């Protein structure tokens, strides 16, 4: 199975939503559409499903154009955020409903429902109604209703957003296990980066009507294409600040606003001459030992997370910076702490926001 999007454009009235979006999905690949609200990711999913029409562009499944077909003939199945289960029907009836509408023979419907229920481990729930199910169970029924159609492509519209934190984590694990048992590709829309990083083979980051980056979760995090991706992916967010270039040879050496010099691993060749910004992940800014550090920061907040502590501080020039310390840190708000900076893992960004990275990033 291959899905190809070619030059998709969409506007609602005078408001553009998607601008020349092109993408190729591979066989059995799990893709996450990640981005803020209003970035166009859900609209694109609905265009693939046939619930919205594109103003321009093409959608091809296995080389066959499907954007001219009605939703039921596209070979895709969509799982909605709000489950969309019929309350007066049992689980079995909900899962069989689409097959009956498609006039699938009755003697085929039962085995299809039973097999999907077995895969999802909800076979013991088939005679219950939605009101008798937990949120996670309802989500599995909604997925099961899609599975019985045996689609080439699953479309998941924020499938975990209605669940509480504990159930969301458990269902995320179940979804990861499910994709190993299902022979179809999947596209999931989410604004939750943890879901995208955990489940996806590749992440498509959206903003401002366009795709900002398409890459594996590791590459999205460690080699962001631009400042938007760098800030949007990662929690706490990356510290990004203007710097001055102080060395024109080899790897770039830059100076922060408080005078701290950072030797990066980014090759100087190819970098713009000025208007450079540095990007530092919190794990690459550490509290120094025995009072040693490249710079000092005044602590404004300490988040103790058990295995580590996140330190939010401010340098002498006023730059807000985020770093890490051990989980049992005794640092308090108002302390002046030394910080070490792992320059080899620092990122640099040009005037247009484009990212530049060293081999260690």
Pin down the residues of each PLM region.
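Conserved ABC transporter NBD signature motif
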Residues: 57-65
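Helix-to-loop junction immediately C-terminal to a conserved catalytic motif
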Residues: 49
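Non-catalytic connector elements of ABC transporters
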Residues: 236-240, 247-361
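Short hydrophobic beta-strand immediately N-terminal to the Walker A/P-loop
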Residues: 31-33, 45
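ABC ATPase nucleotide-binding domains
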Residues: 30, 37, 71-228
